[in-house]
């Protein structure tokens, strides 16, 4: 898979992504986060199914999402719907000594991802709904919602947990929304043309 991974890294580099993002993709092996039957496709730029019926997003979509999120070294970051843990691992490489929290409502996914990432001391994964965020660890510099929200409204509970300045990335329908908070003013930018699994409210 070395050749396939190198092709993916070249493709991401040609798309103009930052050195930090490229280095994270180089360091983290996607095949460890997907089922055995699809490992051969680990470095194809496609979404892959997980055993529970959800998916792991295609690498180019993840790279674009991370570019919007703008993670920085030392930041505190929350991912809601952390799934396989692949994106958490990528973010961990970028924020270094920062702290990353993942909320995953699916118990099996939460258990598997905890085991995969147990050596990443800056990652904490909790098996719980992400609807209310993680107020006991707030505020966060960045919040990433990794499942499609049911409407355009981002819960106030999440906005209130965002540091000022800070950024939330949230999939809504077939678009990615970038919500930025600066000096108590919240602005929104939309990036259409994507597909995401729906947000699950209950396990």
What label would you give each PLM region?
Residues 1-78, 86-90, 109-112, 117, ...:
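Class I SAM-dependent transferase core
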Residues 66, 71-186:
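Conserved nucleotide-cofactor-binding alpha/beta core module
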Residues 142, 202-203:
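Positively charged
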């Amino acid at each position: 898979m070395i050749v396939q991974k190198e092709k993916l890294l070249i493709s991401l580099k040609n798309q103009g992504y930052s050195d930090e993002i490229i280095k994270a993709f180089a360091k983290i092996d996607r095949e460890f986060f997907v089922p055995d039957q699809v490992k051969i496709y680990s470095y194809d730029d496609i979404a892959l199914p997980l055993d529970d019926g959800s998916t792991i997003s295609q690498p180019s979509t993840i790279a674009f999402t991370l570019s919007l999120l703008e993670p920085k070294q030392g930041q505190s970051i929350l991912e809601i719907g952390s799934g396989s843990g692949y994106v958490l691992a990528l973010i961990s490489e970028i924020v270094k000594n920062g702290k990353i929290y993942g909320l995953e409502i699916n118990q099996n996914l939460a258990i598997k991802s905890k085991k995969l990432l147990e050596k990443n001391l800056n990652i904490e994964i909790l098996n719980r709904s992400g609807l209310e965020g993680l107020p006991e660890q707030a505020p966060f510099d960045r919040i990433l919602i990794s499942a499609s929200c049911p409407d355009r409204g981002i819960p106030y509970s999440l906005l209130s947990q965002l540091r000022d300045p800070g950024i939330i990335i949230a999939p809504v329908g077939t678009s990615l929304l970038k919500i930025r908070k600066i000096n108590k003013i919240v602005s929104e930018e939309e990036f259409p043309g994507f597909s995401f699994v729906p947000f699950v409210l209950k396990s």
